[in-house]
Amino acid sequence: MVTSSKGQIEELLATILQHSTAEDEEVLLHLLNGIHDKQQGIHRRYINAALHMVGNFEPDSSEVRIPITPVIHNTIKVPHGGIIATIADAAMGGLASRSVPAGFNVVTTNINVSYIATTTNKELIARGRFVHKGRQTLVMECDIEDETGRKLAIATASFFVIQRRQS
């Protein structure tokens, strides 16, 4: 019995690769590349690394993109609704957190997603913007599309301003 994490990982990877399908290997490579990107400082959070999330934030708008791969598929092989909610939260929350004064951050207090369509295309794109900027509460909205411009969902969310925790 191997007791180190590295040994357990090596054994598990060997077992997985012995029985892997091409899709298993695609997913594993995707996830390992995400961890590698985090180690290289490209991502700060594992969720962003695992999803290969890329964001662009302007003062009043944001755009977050993730590739559509089997990692995010549901049982009918389209992006899972929870992933669509996650990318919307990242676009809105990332924009909200950048708008508050130094020493503060935001937490999501409510999110609502209305799903409109599915896609089998290559990329999810979430575009966030402000509806209301208060001292303690921010209200945001977001459109989620694929790379062809097909609207997949719309989301709204509320964020509460909190003092940033000391690391």
Label each region the model flagged:
Residues 1-125, 131-167:
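Terminal targeting signals and extreme-terminal segments of soluble enzymes
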